[in-house]
UniProtKB/Swiss-Prot annotation:
Lyase listed as a keyword: yes
Gene Ontology molecular function: any one: pyridoxal 5'-phosphate synthase (glutamine hydrolysing) activity
Active site: 82 (schiff-base intermediate with d-ribose 5-phosphate)
Keywords assigned by UniProt, alphabetized: Lyase, Pyridoxal phosphate, Schiff base
Protein name per Swiss-Prot or TrEMBL: Pyridoxal 5'-phosphate synthase subunit PdxS
Positions of D-ribose 5-phosphate binding: 25, 154, 215, 236-237
PROSITE patterns, A to Z: PDXS_SNZ_1, PDXS_SNZ_2
Any one Gene Ontology BP term: pyridoxal phosphate biosynthetic process
Pfam families per UniProt: SOR_SNZ
Principal EC category: lyase
Residues holding D-glyceraldehyde 3-phosphate: 166
Length: 295
Protein backbone atom coordinates (compact mmCIF):
# COMPACT_ATOMS: atom_id res chain seq x y z
CA UNK A 1 0.00 0.00 0.00
CA UNK A 2 1.40 3.40 -0.94
CA UNK A 3 1.31 6.06 1.78
CA UNK A 4 0.42 9.57 0.62
CA UNK A 5 1.99 12.56 2.39
CA UNK A 6 -0.76 14.62 3.98
CA UNK A 7 -3.28 11.77 3.94
CA UNK A 8 -5.49 11.08 6.97
CA UNK A 9 -3.49 7.90 7.60
CA UNK A 10 -0.20 9.79 7.84
CA UNK A 11 -1.54 12.75 9.81
CA UNK A 12 -3.42 10.62 12.32
CA UNK A 13 -0.38 8.38 12.65
CA UNK A 14 1.77 11.39 13.56
CA UNK A 15 -0.71 12.30 16.29
CA UNK A 16 -0.74 8.70 17.59
CA UNK A 17 3.01 8.98 18.15
CA UNK A 18 2.37 11.58 20.89
CA UNK A 19 -0.01 9.29 22.78
CA UNK A 20 0.68 9.05 26.50
CA UNK A 21 2.79 12.19 26.51
CA UNK A 22 2.72 15.82 27.60
CA UNK A 23 2.71 18.80 25.23
CA UNK A 24 3.81 22.10 26.80
CA UNK A 25 3.20 25.73 25.85
CA UNK A 26 6.43 27.72 25.45
CA UNK A 27 7.15 31.32 24.48
CA UNK A 28 10.89 31.16 23.75
CA UNK A 29 13.80 28.81 23.10
CA UNK A 30 14.81 28.59 26.76
CA UNK A 31 11.38 27.35 27.79
CA UNK A 32 11.32 24.93 24.86
CA UNK A 33 14.61 23.40 26.02
CA UNK A 34 13.26 23.07 29.58
CA UNK A 35 10.18 21.28 28.22
CA UNK A 36 12.24 18.92 26.08
CA UNK A 37 14.61 18.11 28.96
CA UNK A 38 11.63 17.36 31.19
CA UNK A 39 10.34 14.78 28.72
CA UNK A 40 7.66 16.67 26.78
CA UNK A 41 6.71 14.88 23.55
CA UNK A 42 6.08 18.21 21.78
CA UNK A 43 5.90 21.94 22.46
CA UNK A 44 3.40 24.61 21.46
CA UNK A 45 5.13 27.83 20.37
CA UNK A 46 3.20 31.00 21.10
CA UNK A 47 3.79 34.63 22.12
CA UNK A 48 1.92 34.45 25.42
CA UNK A 49 0.60 31.58 27.50
CA UNK A 50 -3.20 31.49 27.89
CA UNK A 51 -3.24 33.14 31.34
CA UNK A 52 -1.34 36.13 29.92
CA UNK A 53 -3.62 36.24 26.87
CA UNK A 54 -6.60 36.30 29.23
CA UNK A 55 -5.06 39.04 31.38
CA UNK A 56 -4.05 41.22 28.42
CA UNK A 57 -7.44 41.12 26.69
CA UNK A 58 -7.78 42.59 23.21
CA UNK A 59 -7.21 40.54 20.07
CA UNK A 60 -4.94 37.47 20.33
CA UNK A 61 -3.33 36.42 17.04
CA UNK A 62 -0.87 33.85 15.69
CA UNK A 63 2.58 34.15 17.28
CA UNK A 64 5.26 36.18 15.56
CA UNK A 65 7.00 33.82 13.10
CA UNK A 66 10.32 34.75 14.71
CA UNK A 67 9.22 33.09 17.97
CA UNK A 68 8.05 29.97 16.16
CA UNK A 69 11.35 29.71 14.26
CA UNK A 70 13.35 30.23 17.46
CA UNK A 71 11.53 27.36 19.14
CA UNK A 72 11.85 25.09 16.08
CA UNK A 73 15.61 25.65 16.03
CA UNK A 74 15.98 25.01 19.77
CA UNK A 75 14.49 21.52 20.08
CA UNK A 76 14.36 18.18 18.29
CA UNK A 77 10.81 17.28 19.39
CA UNK A 78 7.76 18.28 17.30
CA UNK A 79 6.70 21.93 17.40
CA UNK A 80 3.08 23.03 17.24
CA UNK A 81 1.72 26.54 16.76
CA UNK A 82 -1.71 28.12 17.07
CA UNK A 83 -3.79 29.74 14.34
CA UNK A 84 -7.05 31.59 14.84
CA UNK A 85 -10.28 29.74 14.14
CA UNK A 86 -11.05 30.15 10.44
CA UNK A 87 -7.89 32.13 9.62
CA UNK A 88 -6.76 30.48 6.37
CA UNK A 89 -3.67 32.65 5.91
CA UNK A 90 -2.29 32.15 9.43
CA UNK A 91 -2.61 28.40 8.92
CA UNK A 92 -0.96 28.52 5.49
CA UNK A 93 1.90 30.62 6.88
CA UNK A 94 2.52 28.11 9.68
CA UNK A 95 2.37 25.24 7.20
CA UNK A 96 4.91 27.02 4.97
CA UNK A 97 7.20 27.49 7.97
CA UNK A 98 7.27 23.74 8.52
CA UNK A 99 5.61 23.40 11.92
CA UNK A 100 4.72 19.83 12.82
CA UNK A 101 1.12 20.54 13.86
CA UNK A 102 -1.28 23.48 13.80
CA UNK A 103 -3.74 24.08 16.62
CA UNK A 104 -6.88 25.84 15.33
CA UNK A 105 -7.36 27.36 18.73
CA UNK A 106 -10.10 29.05 20.71
CA UNK A 107 -7.35 30.54 22.90
CA UNK A 108 -6.80 33.05 20.09
CA UNK A 109 -9.49 35.49 18.97
CA UNK A 110 -11.55 33.80 16.22
CA UNK A 111 -11.11 35.22 12.74
CA UNK A 112 -14.32 33.63 11.47
CA UNK A 113 -17.41 33.14 13.63
CA UNK A 114 -19.16 30.93 11.06
CA UNK A 115 -16.55 28.66 9.47
CA UNK A 116 -13.67 26.60 10.84
CA UNK A 117 -10.72 25.75 8.60
CA UNK A 118 -11.12 22.91 6.10
CA UNK A 119 -8.17 21.07 7.55
CA UNK A 120 -8.26 18.24 5.02
CA UNK A 121 -6.82 20.66 2.43
CA UNK A 122 -3.54 20.99 4.34
CA UNK A 123 -0.56 18.66 4.42
CA UNK A 124 0.22 19.51 8.05
CA UNK A 125 -1.94 17.79 10.71
CA UNK A 126 -4.29 19.83 12.89
CA UNK A 127 -5.37 19.59 16.52
CA UNK A 128 -8.70 21.10 17.58
CA UNK A 129 -10.61 21.54 20.83
CA UNK A 130 -13.99 20.03 21.68
CA UNK A 131 -16.50 20.05 24.50
CA UNK A 132 -18.68 17.18 23.32
CA UNK A 133 -18.91 14.49 20.66
CA UNK A 134 -20.71 16.73 18.17
CA UNK A 135 -17.87 19.27 18.22
CA UNK A 136 -15.31 16.47 18.10
CA UNK A 137 -16.82 14.86 15.01
CA UNK A 138 -17.36 18.15 13.19
CA UNK A 139 -13.66 18.92 13.58
CA UNK A 140 -12.68 15.41 12.44
CA UNK A 141 -15.05 15.80 9.51
CA UNK A 142 -13.14 18.95 8.53
CA UNK A 143 -9.87 17.02 8.73
CA UNK A 144 -8.58 17.32 12.30
CA UNK A 145 -6.07 14.56 13.13
CA UNK A 146 -6.01 15.10 16.88
CA UNK A 147 -8.47 16.39 19.47
CA UNK A 148 -8.16 17.96 22.90
CA UNK A 149 -10.69 19.07 25.46
CA UNK A 150 -11.26 22.80 25.40
CA UNK A 151 -11.37 23.06 29.18
CA UNK A 152 -11.05 26.69 30.24
CA UNK A 153 -7.54 27.83 29.23
CA UNK A 154 -5.43 30.03 31.46
CA UNK A 155 -7.42 29.38 34.63
CA UNK A 156 -5.46 26.61 36.33
CA UNK A 157 -8.89 25.08 37.05
CA UNK A 158 -9.39 21.52 35.84
CA UNK A 159 -13.18 21.35 36.22
CA UNK A 160 -14.07 22.18 32.59
CA UNK A 161 -11.52 19.76 31.12
CA UNK A 162 -13.04 17.05 33.33
CA UNK A 163 -16.53 17.98 32.18
CA UNK A 164 -15.54 17.86 28.49
CA UNK A 165 -13.62 14.58 28.74
CA UNK A 166 -16.45 12.85 30.60
CA UNK A 167 -19.01 14.22 28.14
CA UNK A 168 -17.17 12.99 25.04
CA UNK A 169 -16.45 9.59 26.53
CA UNK A 170 -20.04 9.04 27.70
CA UNK A 171 -21.35 9.98 24.25
CA UNK A 172 -18.87 7.60 22.61
CA UNK A 173 -20.09 4.76 24.85
CA UNK A 174 -23.68 5.60 23.90
CA UNK A 175 -22.86 5.41 20.17
CA UNK A 176 -20.97 2.12 20.55
CA UNK A 177 -24.03 0.57 22.21
CA UNK A 178 -26.49 1.81 19.58
CA UNK A 179 -27.78 -0.35 16.78
CA UNK A 180 -26.56 0.72 13.35
CA UNK A 181 -30.03 1.81 12.25
CA UNK A 182 -30.12 4.36 15.09
CA UNK A 183 -26.92 6.13 14.03
CA UNK A 184 -28.42 8.41 11.38
CA UNK A 185 -30.81 9.94 13.88
CA UNK A 186 -27.95 10.37 16.36
CA UNK A 187 -25.88 12.02 13.62
CA UNK A 188 -28.72 14.51 13.11
CA UNK A 189 -28.95 15.22 16.85
CA UNK A 190 -25.17 15.73 17.17
CA UNK A 191 -24.80 17.63 13.90
CA UNK A 192 -22.05 15.21 12.94
CA UNK A 193 -21.22 13.02 9.90
CA UNK A 194 -22.96 9.62 9.91
CA UNK A 195 -19.80 7.94 8.58
CA UNK A 196 -17.84 9.02 11.65
CA UNK A 197 -20.48 7.67 14.02
CA UNK A 198 -20.28 4.39 12.13
CA UNK A 199 -16.49 4.41 12.59
CA UNK A 200 -16.89 4.92 16.33
CA UNK A 201 -19.32 2.00 16.56
CA UNK A 202 -16.93 -0.23 14.62
CA UNK A 203 -13.77 0.87 16.47
CA UNK A 204 -15.31 1.21 19.92
CA UNK A 205 -13.61 4.60 20.31
CA UNK A 206 -12.87 7.89 18.57
CA UNK A 207 -10.92 7.50 15.30
CA UNK A 208 -8.30 10.02 16.50
CA UNK A 209 -6.50 10.65 19.80
CA UNK A 210 -8.11 12.98 22.35
CA UNK A 211 -5.80 14.81 24.75
CA UNK A 212 -6.75 16.77 27.88
CA UNK A 213 -6.23 20.53 27.84
CA UNK A 214 -7.45 23.66 29.56
CA UNK A 215 -6.76 23.96 33.29
CA UNK A 216 -4.04 21.37 34.00
CA UNK A 217 -1.95 22.93 36.79
CA UNK A 218 -0.57 20.09 38.94
CA UNK A 219 0.75 16.54 38.57
CA UNK A 220 -2.50 15.31 40.13
CA UNK A 221 -4.52 17.20 37.49
CA UNK A 222 -2.57 15.50 34.71
CA UNK A 223 -2.99 12.08 36.33
CA UNK A 224 -6.72 12.68 36.80
CA UNK A 225 -7.22 13.39 33.10
CA UNK A 226 -5.35 10.21 32.16
CA UNK A 227 -7.50 8.30 34.66
CA UNK A 228 -10.58 9.65 32.86
CA UNK A 229 -9.36 8.31 29.53
CA UNK A 230 -7.27 11.09 28.00
CA UNK A 231 -4.66 9.97 25.47
CA UNK A 232 -2.21 12.59 26.73
CA UNK A 233 -2.06 16.06 28.24
CA UNK A 234 -1.54 19.63 27.04
CA UNK A 235 -0.22 22.03 29.69
CA UNK A 236 -0.55 25.72 28.87
CA UNK A 237 0.06 28.16 31.70
CA UNK A 238 0.52 25.48 34.36
CA UNK A 239 4.26 25.00 33.83
CA UNK A 240 5.80 28.41 33.36
CA UNK A 241 3.39 30.24 35.68
CA UNK A 242 4.35 27.88 38.51
CA UNK A 243 6.96 28.79 41.14
CA UNK A 244 9.45 26.20 39.85
CA UNK A 245 8.79 25.47 36.15
CA UNK A 246 11.55 22.86 35.78
CA UNK A 247 10.26 20.77 38.69
CA UNK A 248 6.64 21.15 37.62
CA UNK A 249 7.46 20.11 34.06
CA UNK A 250 9.26 16.94 35.16
CA UNK A 251 6.60 16.08 37.72
CA UNK A 252 3.71 16.49 35.28
CA UNK A 253 5.44 14.29 32.70
CA UNK A 254 6.03 11.54 35.28
CA UNK A 255 2.51 11.81 36.67
CA UNK A 256 1.07 11.49 33.16
CA UNK A 257 3.09 8.34 32.50
CA UNK A 258 2.49 6.77 35.93
CA UNK A 259 -0.98 8.14 36.53
CA UNK A 260 -2.09 5.27 38.76
CA UNK A 261 1.04 5.29 40.93
CA UNK A 262 -0.42 7.43 43.70
CA UNK A 263 2.59 7.12 46.01
CA UNK A 264 4.80 8.49 43.24
CA UNK A 265 2.41 11.36 42.54
CA UNK A 266 2.45 12.23 46.25
CA UNK A 267 6.26 12.29 46.28
CA UNK A 268 6.38 14.32 43.07
CA UNK A 269 4.05 16.90 44.58
CA UNK A 270 5.85 17.38 47.91
CA UNK A 271 8.42 20.05 47.11
CA UNK A 272 7.27 21.65 43.89
CA UNK A 273 6.55 25.09 45.30
CA UNK A 274 3.38 26.97 44.45
CA UNK A 275 1.39 26.07 41.33
CA UNK A 276 -0.03 28.79 39.11
CA UNK A 277 -2.76 30.88 40.68
CA UNK A 278 -6.17 29.53 39.72
CA UNK A 279 -9.41 31.22 38.66
CA UNK A 280 -12.93 30.21 39.67
CA UNK A 281 -14.83 29.48 36.44
CA UNK A 282 -18.16 30.73 37.80
CA UNK A 283 -16.66 34.20 38.19
CA UNK A 284 -15.93 34.44 34.44
CA UNK A 285 -18.47 36.16 32.22
CA UNK A 286 -19.68 34.25 29.15
CA UNK A 287 -17.63 36.48 26.83
CA UNK A 288 -14.51 35.68 28.87
CA UNK A 289 -14.97 31.91 28.50
CA UNK A 290 -12.66 30.83 25.70
CA UNK A 291 -14.37 27.43 25.48
CA UNK A 292 -17.46 29.15 24.02
CA UNK A 293 -15.54 30.10 20.86
CA UNK A 294 -16.12 27.92 17.83
CA UNK A 295 -18.96 25.45 17.40
Amino acid sequence: MSVILGSDLVKRGMAQMQKGGVIMDVVNAEQARIAEAAGAVAVMALERVPSDIRAAGGVARMANPRIVKEVMEAVSIPVMAKARIGHITEARVLEAMGVDYIDESEVLTPADEEFHLLKSEYTVPFVCGCRDLGEALRRIGEGASMLRTKGEPGTGNIVEAVRHMRKVNSQVRKVVNMSTDELMTEAKILGAPFELLLQIKQLGKLPVVNFAAGGVATPADAALMMELGADGVFVGSGIFKAENPEKFARAIVQATTHYQDYDLIARLSEELGEPMRGLEISKLSVQDRMQERGW
